[in-house]
Amino acid sequence: MDEQNRALYETPTEIEVTAKDSLVHVGSLDSFDITKGGIKAGKLLLKYLDNGNEKLLHQAIKTYEKIIPDENFGGEYTALEWLCKYFLAPEEAKQDLLSKPLIKSFYDVLSKDDFADLRTYIQLKYHIVEVDKNDVETKRKLRFLEDFILFNNPDRERWEKTRENMEKFNIQPGERIADVGSGPGYFSFKFADIVGDEGKVYAIETNPMHLDFLRDHIKENDIKNVEVVVSQFEGIGLTEDVRVDTVFVCSLYHNVYAAFTDFEREKFVGSIRHALVEGGKLIIVDNDLVDSSELPYHGPYISKSLLTSQLYHYGFKLIDNYQFTPQRYVLIYEKVDVPSDFKGKENSIDDPCHIHVNTAGSLIRYRIIGTSTAGYSIRGKACGKMMYDGFMENDPEKVQKAHDMFAELWPKERIGDDYTAFMWFCEYYLADDNKKAEMLSDYRDKMYFDFFGGNDYEKLKKYLYIKFYLEHEEAEDADIETCFEYEGKDFPIGTLNEWNEYFVFNNPNRFLWEKTDTMLDLLDIKEGESIADLGCGGGYFTYEFSKMVGDKGTVYATEINKDAMKYLDALKDTYNVKNIKTLVTRMNDCKLKENSCDKVFMCSMYHAVYITDIEFVKDEFIASIKKGLRPGGQLIIVDNDVTDRFTPSYYGPGIMPELIISQLSFYGFKLVKKEQLIPQRFILVFELQ
């Protein structure tokens, strides 16, 4: 047993950071996982579907054979190559393949209506046709097809060694298995064959399209020992009386770790513990990072040490682990008592590469509450309805009450969300003319008000109504800790999210929760300096920096989201601001000229770099920062901390500062200052060594 594996068993709550690579990755914000070879082969397959020319299939297969080992190990390419070979196979061979139920269902889904879904998948996946940002249904369809083609791939054995790892699971006839996050049931139906008529498999899934496929496949093939279960964030969905011998979680726990709130994850893992018999097994299959240019990238991943350290605190003891390919591992845990006398060790920024995991909380989270929208809570909804009614009825008493309700609530939940912004609009509504003029004396605040408050608060009213889904009444017994989402279809989701970002980040009351003035003083920005605001959003800090550096200074405002940049461009043009230069960038390049900046500033962004950037993308991005910094220049990172369960958390993403400090140390940055003005927010200042 090597040293790393030994540590998983002997010191499960300690993590050694030994390289620049992130410990967890949940997927790219950009399309760097789409390769030229994949696009070429996809177009050849698409063209074959149109004209039936088999030469195109041979060309596609030749392309896939060249790129699969290097570009897309474990991805969709092996499935698409399988389809090409199927189309070329003799009729007898085709019939033999389709005699296998899962392969037949795979082909049936993709071939229906003259391969309509396969055509849609190739066109959207490889950006041959672009999907509208507000077309939620098409995006959901694409997500289903991505999962379906990836997971029910008839050639999955080729990259995963499925038979070998299933032997490691040691599933026995008669056992009861919960397949959590079953997707379209690849493992569920394999487990069903093993456990036999005396056993039972629960295929547990949240995606409605996967659920429909599972039910149809079970009905069509008269499968008696698989039961479909609808899961929610509150738990895996099994009824209180169901007990299972094994819970199986494949290609999911990286999301449980990084995308669930602590509350959601406690419910989720708690329901797994409840369902397992004493001594029952939790089997996790997930992706590992391969730090080698000779082996291809394989999508989301989570380090075994990060995963094991968390599950230790939930009462799961690692009893076996197996690396059946460099990119894929199996971890097998036994349900034991939850540690009751654990004594944690303090972490130190002086030794950031040695991390003590003292609780079950994640060291980083990425899910902004509400995955389709900005989301809302039950308590927030009550405040929002009071404010909406007050503005619609022009009732100062209700507006005042809404203000007071938000003022009481915002320190308790969703720090940094829009509650203090709602308070600002209530304050403006209730103010006299002199106070209103004072509140709009700042250019940025005037534009902010005009956008949401113009035409008798038209957009503000709409935002309140949609944000809190006021047309829909929540159940009276809804849990106040649960996050809800707007589910209506009469307002574009993309527009709502765009409004939400502008509403939150350019909030004139932002200083209430962030202590912005104190933060800006600590940054020591001088007149005449050049500063880059990376991921500037609506330009809140860009505008502040513009005032601080003066006419002789320059602020480079960079953003990958063109829609966010338009608010800043409008401010520049309307008020003739000369010292701001806007740059539309990509995740791998901040587009700064060499030695152009005294300071590079990133607010609420590095967590995304850490958890969503493919490693080579992160390498290139940080190299572009180093290129742009002048000798002696500083990299300043403001981000959201992960808090303990007794401290209200920032409403969206968060990251343990030690993860940033340790990672940047491998890129040659030395921490020179750390400040923590509030529990939910920290400032890190780095210089190149």
What kind of feature is each model-predicted range?
Residues 174-183, 528-537:
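Conserved class I S-adenosyl-L-methionine
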Residues 238-247, 590-600:
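A short acidic, Gly/Pro-enriched loop at the edge of an enzyme's catalytic core
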Residues 193, 264-278, 616-631:
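A short glycine-rich, Lys/Arg-flanked "PGG" loop and its adjoining helix->strand segment in the class I
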Residues 12, 16, 21-46, 52-58, ...:
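Class I SAM-dependent transferase core
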Residues 207, 561-562:
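Conserved SAM/SAH-binding beta-strand->alpha-helix loop
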Residues 245-263, 598-616:
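A short SAM/SAH-binding and catalytic strip from SAM-dependent methyltransferases
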Residues 279-286, 632-639:
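Conserved beta-strand signature within the Rossmann-like core of class I S-adenosyl-L-methionine
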